[in-house]
């Protein structure tokens, strides 16, 4: 029998829509799976970035909205992380795109999270605050964010040390006390 998303959710027929639809279906099966990864390609926008980025952000937004609607009554048990493995430069290149940069962003949705705030620090855009005068400076290591996530919602003892050997995470403060 085909999966019927909850709450009238509708997933688009694209990479991220199909992937989150599949994850939601497995979550609803209560198989005890604790972690999923989903990829969404196309973000490497070295040329013609404005329309491409608008399309990608729209697809991601609609897919996350459908996922949220679908799993609404289960969101107290779902941690969602949106991240990239690299950032983008602050200025456009000659092809109206951006090249790889240093810092990026991470979006976290989880139960008991201290939401509505930016965690980390904002270095600003002044030339002296940029890495190599062209890149936003990284202020929070993604491993620190992930370490808090595996320690709190997943309640996995020593998970951070197992996942990130030889790394000492800094407190990010993602969760309300």
Annotated model-derived regions:
Residues 1-177:
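Ligand-binding pockets and gating/stacking loops
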């Amino acid at each position: 029998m085909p999966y019927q998303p909850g709450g009238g959710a509708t997933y688009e027929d694209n990479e991220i829509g199909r992937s989150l639809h599949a994850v939601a279906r497995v979550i609803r099966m209560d198989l005890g799976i604790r972690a999923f990864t989903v990829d969404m390609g196309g973000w490497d926008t070295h040329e013609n970035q404005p329309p491409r980025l608008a399309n990608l952000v729209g697809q991601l937004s609609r897919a996350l909205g459908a996922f949220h609607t679908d799993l609404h009554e289960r969101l107290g048990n779902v941690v969602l992380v949106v991240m990239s493995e690299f950032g983008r430069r602050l200025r456009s290149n000659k092809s109206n795109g951006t090249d790889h940069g240093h810092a990026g962003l991470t979006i976290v949705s989880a139960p008991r999270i201290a939401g509505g705030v930016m965690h980390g620090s904002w270095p600003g855009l002044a030339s002296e605050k940029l890495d190599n005068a062209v890149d936003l400076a990284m202020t929070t290591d993604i491993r620190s964010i992930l370490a808090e996530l595996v320690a709190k919602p997943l309640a996995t003892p020593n998970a951070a040390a197992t996942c990130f050997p030889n790394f000492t995470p800094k407190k990010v403060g993602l969760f309300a006390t």
